[in-house]
A protein has these predicted regions:
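Gly/Pro-rich hinge or "lid" segments in bacterial periplasmic/extracellular proteins
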Residues: 76, 82-97, 189-259, 266-270, ...
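Extracellular/periplasmic solute-recognition and catalytic clefts
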Residues: 146, 164-166, 226-238, 263-327, ...
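Append "and occasionally in soluble cytosolic enzymes with long acidic Gly/Pro-rich linkers
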Residues: 238, 331-459
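A short beta-strand/turn structural motif
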Residues: 141-145, 158-161, 181-224, 250-257, ...
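Surface-exposed binding/hinge segments that line
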Residues: 121, 156-203, 221-229, 373-389
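Short, well-ordered beta-strand elements
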Residues: 26, 52-61, 107, 117-120, ...
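Aromatic- and charge-enriched surface segment that lines or borders ligand/interaction sites
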Residues: 45-50, 72-79, 108-152, 168, ...
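N-terminal lobe/hinge region of extracytoplasmic solute-binding protein
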Residues: 23-114, 144, 151, 218-220
Length: 483
């Protein structure tokens, strides 16, 4: 017995020595977390908000039904809202910061100084919907289940760089990474956790994970499934009166509705009309034409329905035309500049987008990470050693695309000059290089993308003499092409 105790002590000592890091309540990929360790609630949450009532939602996608309550397997269509309302993760992102996580099921996190691993301590108050405590064994079970062959392959892909999960003690779990990478801490923080008791059969024996279909999840989230109407595509969640996290800082003031209903619609236009008729409560609109022209009528004029833009600081989804830089012709920045000049954003915005779009100036537009003005002193310190290899424009003011108010003809003239500098000259009916080879552009057009917006751009490129080859592809082929 004495030998075992000494061995255990040495093992714990080795673990402590090999993991030199301090416990953190939050992790920020950029800078420091906004909220201190003793924060009471997120700024955007209202702890005094009244509780009760019913919120009725529709999905952001079109579907007429769902057929399972397990969102982690391949077959079938999961019920909407499960991941957001029923399941919880080790950590949760704040909505007013860029890439910052705070402990949810975990009350502290220890990221190794060399970014090779992370340790989570599970909040002792955390409980599943059946009243069981959330333990390290549940975390490891969830991880191993999701990377197993009974779960969707997308989870194996998502956690591909996580080497293993191991139990340190009853409420402490460690994840080792396959490579030193601090971003993997955020990957692990997004691990959904569920009870191993979810999916037991009538005799208490566990079902294969892909056989868990209609059994209500046993998880730790604020809501549980109250009613699932698989035939009509209606679903009701009920706020768990014994929800463990109601007073946790990352949850306080949130999840205030007693019930949340989901209604499914097989057609987007039908969904829009249902919203206008008051069938459900919130509609997030992504089509410029609808935003401009559809949401009108008595309910709007009398204030019963409200149309409102909400500013945000999230990284926006990228929407644009992407150059394949593996093609030699696009490796010349002058060619890319000429192609950019041919895109008449103002015309497209006015005639197709109802002047509702804004031209981005950064991959991180609307966030604190977006570049602006001249490089800072710290940025210059990083850039100076590479000055001879960088475009001089890098050291100047940030390019402001909307500021270029020249008409299309003037921009095309400049674009033609840039192409000539790059060795592409118009002759014999096409844009050609010194070998006489034409500039052929293959445009991969994915099904579902409105063609007028891209046809206008392709027509402008044709004025340079670019030969356009259009290829219509489906979503699967398009993803394969990108790879």
């Amino acid at each position: 017995m004495k030998t075992k105790v000494i061995f255990a002590f040495i093992s714990l000592l080795f673990l402590a020595l090999s993991f030199s890091a301090s416990a953190e309540h939050g992790l920020a990929l950029y800078g420091e977390p906004k909220y201190p360790a003793n924060f009471l609630h997120f700024d955007y949450a209202n702890p005094q908000a009244p509780k009760g009532g019913t919120l009725t939602l529709a999905t952001s996608y079109t579907a007429s039904s769902f057929d399972k309550l397990n969102p982690f397997t391949v077959r079938g269509r999961p019920a909407p809202g499960l991941l957001e309302l029923v399941f919880e993760t080790l950590a949760v992102y704040s909505l007013d910061e860029t890439m910052t996580q705070y402990g949810l099921l975990a009350d502290d996190m220890q990221l190794a100084e060399d970014y090779s691993s992370i340790v989570f301590h599970i909040n002792p108050r955390a409980r599943f919907s059946n009243g069981d405590p959330v333990l390290a064994s549940d975390v490891v079970y969830s991880f191993e289940t999701l990377i197993g062959d009974k779960a969707s392959p997308r989870f194996r892909s998502f956690f591909a760089k996580i080497a293993k999960a191991s139990i340190v003690d009853n409420r402490t779990v460690r994840f080792d990474f396959k490579e030193a990478n601090r971003e993997l801490a955020f990957v692990v923080g997004a691990l959904p956790v569920f009870s191993r008791k979810w999916g037991l059969d009538d005799k208490g024996a566990p079902l294969a994970f892909d056989q868990i279909v209609h059994q209500p999840p046993i998880a730790s989230g604020p809501y549980t499934v109250e009613e699932a109407d698989y035939g009509r595509g209606n679903l009701t969640y009920r706020l768990n009166p014994d929800y463990w996290g109601v007073d946790e800082p990352v949850r306080k003031g949130t999840h205030n509705f007693e019930r949340i209903n989901y209604k499914l619609f097989r057609d987007y236009d039908l969904q829009v009309e249902a919203f206008k008729a008051g069938v459900f409560d919130i509609m997030v609109e992504g089509k410029a034409r609808n935003w401009c022209c559809v949401y009108k009528g008595v309910r709007f004029s009398e204030g019963e329905a409200i149309k409102k833009l909400f500013p945000h600081k999230n990284i926006p989804a990228m929407n644009g035309y992407i150059f394949n830089l593996r093609k030699e012709r696009f490796q010349d920045v002058r060619v890319r500049r000429a192609f950019t000049l041919a895109f008449d954003f103002d015309w497209v915005n006015k005639n197709i987008f109802y002047e509702e779009y804004r031209q981005p100036y950064s991959y991180f537009s609307t966030t604190e990470l977006a570049a602006s003005g001249l490089p800072s002193e710290d940025e210059l310190g990083l850039l100076e050693p590479w000055r001879d290899q960088l475009d001089p424009a890098v050291f100047g003011s940030m390019v402001d695309l909307p500021a270029d108010k020249r008409n299309l003809r003037e921009r095309l003239i400049e674009g033609q000059r840039l192409l000539e500098e790059a060795g592409w000259v118009y002759r014999d009916g096409a844009l050609r290089n010194a070998k006489g080879e034409p500039f052929v552009l293959e445009a991969s057009l994915t099904e579902g993308i409105p063609l007028p917006r891209i046809e206008t751009y392709l027509r402008n490129l044709g004025q340079y003499g670019v030969i356009i080859k259009r290829r219509l592809t489906d979503q699967v082929s398009s993803r394969r092409d990108m790879q």
